[in-house]
Amino acid sequence: MKTVQRERRYVCGQTKQNAIYQEVEIYTVGTDKKSREREKEKSTPIPFRGKNPEKWDGHNAKRSRKWFCRLLATNFTEQDTHTSLTYSDEFLPKTEEQADRDINNFLRRLRTKCKAQSLPPPEAITVTEHQDADPETGQKAVRFHHHVILKCGLSRDDIESCWHRKKKPMGWANCDRLQLDKGSLEALANYLMKYPKRKHRWKRTKGIIDPILPRPNDSKYTRRGIQKIATDPAILHDRDFWAKKYPGWELIEAQAEHNEYWGWSIMLKMHRIPERRGRPYAC
């Protein structure tokens, strides 16, 4: 079967020019119909809307975490927040529909407060999670709760104050700034996805965009070149080497994996080097 060595980039930002983070995957891909279909699925962003797909484990879970990290890096910065919302016994919903109404009301109050303070509308990704008890398997119940990744000009106190019903707090609300240093995006994605058997419902507001996927490059690397890089740690983790390959970008992390069928693959995480002396960013 004929193969090519593909470079696929995931540029995380509103535009290619202002993006400050990107991931690069370098790997072997077949040119047959089945390989093309698999490649199309791999490069299709996960929407993170509605319920999780039925099969959300193994490879699918790994792929979901990667896309969630990219979605966060594309839309949020250290100025944005992660808010956890829980329920007291009095307000604990009995159905998913009620929990959905509660989070919609929370977002509506945020929009109202932003409008009153002449702030842009909030942008958010929300995750509602719960689990029913199952005596046969020993599975314990998990109460309804929500996670909200939020871009909003309101103070943290104002954000937390929106979690109420008829002016009465519905439970505990805790709002913290996002930490976007090394490994923190993965940690947050793992935290929100660590229980794949629980029921999840995702929501994203208008304004949340997917990462930018430039056209893949099938001529930049050779199979022998990928193997040489992957098997030599001095090259794999050499920032100067990758800076020449991707001008304007600085290596954060490099990983190499070997597959018995496809051979070596490389995954890079990179930050944009700050602009200097008025020179435009390279992309």
Walk through the language-model features, giving the residues of each.
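Right-hand nucleic-acid polymerase module
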Residues: 1-142, 152-283
